[in-house]
């Protein structure tokens, strides 16, 4: 293998050559992204640069907003749809809700699954198969709003995320950077807006 550098260990009075594949490994480590989902997944790519570029190019981010009454309607819809959870528990739910002006917040697609990432990926697949754009859409999940959830929704082009659960610090930081509104602890008439509150109309 081609030699790219030499390292000297003074204590042992020895040196060794660093082959090219180790240099490539170090380059990959420089691009490492550690996410905050289950098990802290690690991605070795320029993922964040791609996500930022995607978010900036999506017009759906620019005007996205939601009213307080619409948040309440989405929460009520979610409670009524979770048949498997109410029967047996042990599953997560994700939904894509209509956020067009004058809509009732009805669910365009709803899925329950033992894995929250399986559920969000099902939403992504449905949008692709049905040629559904991200405009006037709300994403709802029962799972935590982690960095992975924020990244996936940014790639979908959805700027408003609701969750029955809370958020993580990295999820919050990414949402702040990308312009995504995170709304957590959605139960009954209660919710907490964690990021970009300017996207929420609290008067209607």
Q: Which functions belong to the PLM regions below?
A:
Residues 111-115:
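Short beta->alpha transition motifs characteristic of CBS
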């Amino acid at each position: 293998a081609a030699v790219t550098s030499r390292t000297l260990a003074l204590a042992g009075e020895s040196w060794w050559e660093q082959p090219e594949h180790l240099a490539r490994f170090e380059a990959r480590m420089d691009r490492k992204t550690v996410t905050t989902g289950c098990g802290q997944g690690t991605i070795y790519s320029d993922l964040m640069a791609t996500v930022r570029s995607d978010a900036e190019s999506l017009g759906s981010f620019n005007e996205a907003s939601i009213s307080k009454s619409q948040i309440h309607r989405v929460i009520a819809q979610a409670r009524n749809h979770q048949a498997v959870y109410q029967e047996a528990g042990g599953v997560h739910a994700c939904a894509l809700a209509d956020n067009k002006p004058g809509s009732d917040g009805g669910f365009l697609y709803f899925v329950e699954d033992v894995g929250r990432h399986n559920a969000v990926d099902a939403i992504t697949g449905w949008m692709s198969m049905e040629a559904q754009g991200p405009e006037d859409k709300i994403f709802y999940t029962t799972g935590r709003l982690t960095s992975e959830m924020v990244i996936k929704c940014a790639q979908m082009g959805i700027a408003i995320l609701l969750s029955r659960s809370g958020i993580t610090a990295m999820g919050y930081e990414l949402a702040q950077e990308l312009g995504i509104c995170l709304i957590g602890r959605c139960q009954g008439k209660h919710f907490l807006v964690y990021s970009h509150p300017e996207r929420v109309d609290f008067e209607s």
